Amino acid sequence: MIRRRGPPSQTWRTFLRNHAEAIATIDLCVVPTLTFERLFAFLVLGHGRRQLLWYAVTRHPTSEWLAQQILEAFPWNAAPTYLVRDNDRVYGQAFTRRLRTMGIRDRPISPRSPWHNPYAEQLIGTLRRDCLDHVLIFNERHLRGVLTLYSLYY
């Protein structure tokens, strides 16, 4: 069989470069406190300028809470076209329903493959190395303040 000669398709790297402004990535970061409680920091990162767009802190993330946070992260039709995320169970039906109503195309990564979401993992690693490894977090309010200062730095 003769192979068809068509226009060459673009590579994944070219696609990401061309659509970087329309892609955002999200992830949850676990932060231990001084009293050995676990806090969860929800981080939203824009691919275009690799800018921290939104963060929120909670003790118990739920699908409804994440749906509200994604609405607050992208108000007034500022939502990206694509949202890259991991396959955490906390992203439930309420969250995916909210993405559909906002017109965001959900792109979950493969299970157990954090390297498919490198920008979010790099942000979390940098946040830990530059900030959280040097600060003892007391409570949610303290973590919000630390993230506010870090977002100005990042």
Report the location of each language-model feature.
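Charged DNA-binding/catalytic regions of mobile-element recombinases
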Residues: 1-154
